Structure formats: C-alpha cells, structure tokens
Amino acid sequence: MKISTIFKYIFIVFAIGIIIYGGYKIYKNNNQEEEQENDSQTVAQEEIIQDIRLAVTNYDTINPILTNNKEILNIDTLIFEPLFTFSSDYILTPCLAKECSKTGDNTYVIKVNNSVNWQDGTSFMSKDVAFTIDVIKQSNSIYKYNVEHITNVEVVDASTLKLTLDGNVPFFEYNLTFPILSSNYYLGEDFFTSSKTPIGTGRYKISSINSNSITLSKNENWRNPEAEEIKLDNIKINLYTSMGEAFNSFKIGNVDVLNTTNTNFGEYIGTIGFNKVEYAGREFDFLALNCNDVILKDKAVRQALGYAIDKDTIVSSVYNNQKFVSQYPLDYGNYLYTSENVSSGYNAEQAKKVLEDGGWTYRNGHWKKEIDGSYRTLRLNIAVNKDQERRVQASEKIKEQLKDIGIEVTINKITNDQYSKYISNKDYQILYTGVYNSFTPDLTYYFSSGNIENYYNEEMQELINNSAIIKDSKQQKEIFQKIYTLYKEDVPFIGICRNKNITITSQSLYGNIEPSNYTTYNKAELWYRK
C-alpha cells in the first residue's frame, strides 16, 4: 500500500472523529441549554405570586347597589357586570347586553346574552335586569341617577326587555352601566335586609367576608374561554378604619394597590419604593361667561380672556399642582377628545391683539369700545362662592392676570344661597363654577338651549343634536372635533382645572396598570406579584 493511501485513510478516520465529536458537543450543549431554559422557566413560574392585596377604608357592604363606598364600587367591577361597560378611554362596549336599539323617541329594546351564568350556575336572563332596575329605584343607590328616566320595564322574553323613558335622553345607553344582580338569588326575601353574600357574573367571586378582610377568587366558570389566560387567582381586600392605617399597611408591604385623591400621600409612605399613575378625574372647574352680557356677548372679549388666563400658574400657585390644567369637559381621558388638543392656551400678547382686531382701543390704561351707540370700558365681575377658598384664590389670580393686559376685574364673593340663585337665574357676568362630569359625552349642559352661559349658536345646536344620534365611531369623532373647534372659536366658557386621582402600586406588582374613573382594575386579571 502506498504511503499516500495510508495518509488518506488516516485523514478520513480523523475527519470522521472530528465530526462525531462535534456532533456530540452540539448535542450536549443543546441539552444543557434546554435544561437551563426549563430550569429558568420553573424558577420564573415559582416566583410568580398569583394573588394581590387591596385596601378599603370605612367599609359598609360589598353589595354594589347598597354601598356608598367609592372604593367598593371600584372593586365591585371585578365581581359584578353591567349591560354595557367602558374601556380605559371610555368607549362604551357591550358586556351582558348583546345589543341596544332605540325603537321610538322614548323606547329602547335590549337583547341580553343568555349564554352567561351567575356564579351559582343559574342562567342570566332579562328579568334580572328588570329586578336590578326595580331595587335601584327603591333605594338611595349611587346608581339611582342611571335609572331615573326609566318609567317602565317590560320583560318581553328571557333574552329581551323593553325600556320606556320619560323623555328623550341623549346617550341613554351610557346609563346602562350599573351592575346587574340575580333575581332568583333573592327570591322570597327582602333584598335590602338580606344577609346573603351577593353573586355576580364577573371574573371573580366572593369567597369569604370577615371583619378584617374580604377574599375574592377566580370564577372558574367565567363565560369567555378565549380571553387571555388569567394570571390572578385571588384578591384579598384588607379593611381599615382610616386612610392613615391603609397608607401604613402599604408602606410595610401588606397592600399592593392603593387608590387615593390625597396628593400629599408621600407624607405617609415616603417618596421611593413604589410606582404611581396619576390620571384626570371628573371634577371640572370652569368660568361660565354670560354670553347675553353687553360686554361678553362680544366674542373677541371671550377669546381674549381665553388667551389671557394662565392656567398653569393657577394650578401651581393656588392648587400646588394638586390638580391638572383643564380646558374642556371631555379632557379626562375620553376618546372623543384627542390629546393633541391639550394646551393651557396662555398668550397675553395674542389676547391684546384679539381685542384690537375686535375693535377695542387701549388708552389711558383702559380698553374701550363703542357698543350700541355708547362707549364701554372693559370691566368684568367674577362671582365666586366665598366658601370655596381655592376658587376664591384662583379668582384673585385671574384678576391679577387680566390686570396685566389692562382688563379691570372685581371679585364678588357670594353665599351658597346667592350661588344657587346665580346658577338658576344666570344672574352674573362671569361665574367661577364646577361640575362633576358624567361618563356620557353629552355636552348639552354647555352648548344646548338653556345652557349655563346663555350661549346660542345654530351650527353648534345642530352638531350637538347629531352627536347623540350618530352611532358610527368615526363619524362621531368627526362631529365632536367640529364641536370642539367651534367651542374654541366662540369660547362660551373657559376651563381651569380638574381633580387628580392617583393609583399607587408596590414595586412587586406586575402588569399594565391603566386606571380610569370607571375602574382602577382594567385587565387586573393579568396582574401578578413577584
């Protein structure tokens, strides 16, 4: 055998050996990586804690119709469900209802989802809705406003009911967001004195109630098998006598989620070791401008006021940044008001220019204009409830800001009785006032006939009427944008600020925390602890 042939065989054997060894190393490495991945997944699974701890102060009852506790109402959204619910940006979506049709000026027909079961296994039916409306009407429930216009409820069949109203109610469907309770569950007993633990149709059910806590557990029979896998198995609601006690419990790690309107919460829990989400509430403060007033009927004056008032300074100096700057009734996160619109609008020089363009002349320290054959000096009066100290201070700040551009302002501090009469009679020039915005996007209070500012614009009236009729979301957004654009042109009122809500969470809590005024617990079933 030739030497070259021997070397060739040796080389082949050597090459095969290298290939076999390489394959072995790859196999071994893959096995090690797979074992490590399995180990890490096991560890990660072990680290996930599938329960959270909440806090409630001044507990009264878990019954959603009878409770007056705001946080209980918040938590009850996990247990009980309405006909319609809200997304985190306040889009109305079906829940227990399949559809709602307006069949006449004052009548609605609702189809309910009969595939839903109560947490005791019985079927949800339209008679449960009728029962709930009836007990709300008999009670002093916080939901009484939702049903006050319903004059008759007819159960057509197990999946259909017909509601008759006392008149035309814009956006009535938005009132159908109250929790529904089972009629059979309370059959033969007094709902208002029942000692039964309420049942719902939601993702969680009440497992136990004692003097110190309430425990919720996952509803294994919840109707939507296609929903994302629920990570959260149990929720413990700790009951406290005061917010100070709840803050302290959060601080030492016994509470994972705490809702508060107290912007000074850092005094109780410190400034580190937690996460927070601040979001705009529904308490809207604004200046109502009487559009029938001889001065304020001039649109240029109203526009100038909108530019001349520095809301950022008011919120920082008067409210110590405990509120959000606000300019519009829907700027609490409603999808019909886009974030691009958000601006305090302050521009003192533009305010002066608007007055000049509107025919006002500044001389001898005053703005003057001929109106109805007489020369008028631009002097304004702001009426404010004297018991509302912060509003009085804000009015004084506005007075200073308007003085800087040559507008004289007098502050009229009025009593509660005077304030009520001013509202009823619209007997004011400018009124510093406020409202609690509902979840409905209805803007009739500000723009329709009989509104608080004596404002009338035929185009606006048509837009407001159409806004309640159009159901297509794209068209609806277009209409609300036109309403906002016209508002900016006419300025019948000037938004100042709105309250600030805060959700505080422990750093061990994971998941998307997206609180809204409807509920803190949007997609809470996907939360977990580590």
Predicted regions and their residues:
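Detector for C-terminal structural segments
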Residues: 19, 213, 308-339, 390-399, ...
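N-terminal lobe/hinge region of extracytoplasmic solute-binding protein
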Residues: 55-104, 134, 199
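A structural "hinge/loop" feature
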Residues: 56-76, 96-97, 122, 172-181, ...
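Gly/Pro-rich hinge or "lid" segments in bacterial periplasmic/extracellular proteins
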Residues: 70, 91, 176-230, 234-236, ...
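Aromatic- and charge-enriched surface segment that lines or borders ligand/interaction sites
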Residues: 98-140, 162, 295
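Surface-exposed binding/hinge segments that line
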Residues: 101-103, 109, 145-187
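Ligand-site clamp/hinge motif
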Residues: 222-268, 408-410
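Append "and occasionally in soluble cytosolic enzymes with long acidic Gly/Pro-rich linkers
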Residues: 297-399, 482
